[in-house]
Amino acid sequence: MAFDFKKEFKEFYMPKNKPEIVNVPKANYIAVRGKGNPNEEGGAYQQAISILYAVAYTLKMSYKTDYKIKGFFEYVVPPLEGFWWQDDVVGVDYTNKSAFNWISVIRLPDFISKADFDWAIETATKKKKIDCSSAEYLTIDEGLCVQIMHIGSFDNEPATVDLMDTYIEQNGYVNDINKDRLHHEIYMSDARKAAPEKWKTVIRHPIKKA
């Protein structure tokens, strides 16, 4: 049975639909940075997603090639995730999607080294005929956070974020969102197949003691 991050680390991928505090360990990711409306057809965000999956599946299927990754075991590609922010905006203006900056990521198993990653970039670019050079090997140490499972459209996130803010205030914490610690989403539903009102998205915010 292939290793599945969603099942092995349920506390980070399947929170309840009420806020909870977690300490998220350091992990490595495939990452692509960009700016702009994520809904733009053929836009930068959709191109980034194509690059992420091209690299992710090249690594996942590497055991069927001559390239051998030390310590490799079969695994399920983890869910798509995203870190989001807007310049010069207090909070988030969900109506101005073109102002979003983002880092789109997919988690890597710990056995994937930078050398393995570089091999995958070169291989995916060559075999899948897509330029993957914008992908980077990124280590993220999130630390102390509040998270919740948001169910519904992304446009309805503000009400869920309000629940998170109230919860941390009641428990002696404050938001610690800054240029290094960002609004984080993990997409647990396939938006192409599920109705928006059924989308499941983990929302995670960095916090610190008040």
Mark where each language-model region is.
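A solvent-exposed interaction/effector surface
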Residues: 1-210
